[in-house]
């Protein structure tokens, strides 16, 4: 997964995951991440697919997991979330353009959904994640390891293997 997460890239990633899961639900699949994030709803669709497939999904960050891509990075199977030593996890404040109160509530719901999901997969609670998003915090791989965002940090060899 490289570049912005869009509706199109999410559809492609989800289709590949469902195909691999149908082929062999016991074989792990690896999702390599170097993305600044992107469309919130598309990211949530990928997250839902990761939670749905029976095959373990290993996540490997090489470069940046920014914005919404952080959720994909932390959603990998426990013990199988890796990052290269120079990887960066970069929170961003969600920016929405809305004109109605209902749209504003939906935006707040999306931010809360991201914060809660990231909190479930890390050592941070929902409020701490929301604060990190609001402050646009950055974490290098070793800090991400200490905070429970990743299970292993190392060199490029962490990116080998998987389907």
Regions found by a protein language model. Name each.
Residues 1-163:
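Terminal-region recognition feature
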């Amino acid at each position: 997964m490289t570049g912005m997460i869009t509706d199109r890239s999410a559809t492609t990633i989800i289709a590949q995951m469902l195909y691999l899961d149908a082929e062999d639900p016991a074989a792990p699949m690896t999702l390599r991440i170097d993305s600044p994030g992107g469309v919130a709803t598309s990211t949530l669709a990928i997250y839902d697919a990761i939670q749905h497939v029976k095959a373990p999904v290993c996540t490997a960050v090489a470069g940046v997991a920014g914005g919404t891509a952080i959720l994909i990075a932390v959603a990998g199977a426990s013990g199988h979330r890796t990052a290269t030593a120079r990887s960066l996890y970069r929170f961003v404040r969600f920016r929405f353009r809305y004109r109605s109160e209902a749209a504003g509530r939906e935006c707040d719901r999306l931010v809360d959904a991201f914060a809660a999901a990231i909190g479930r997969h890390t050592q941070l609670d929902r409020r701490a994640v929301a604060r990190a998003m609001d402050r646009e915090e950055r974490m290098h791989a070793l800090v991400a390891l200490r905070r429970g965002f990743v299970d292993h940090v190392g060199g490029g060899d962490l990116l080998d293997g998987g389907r």
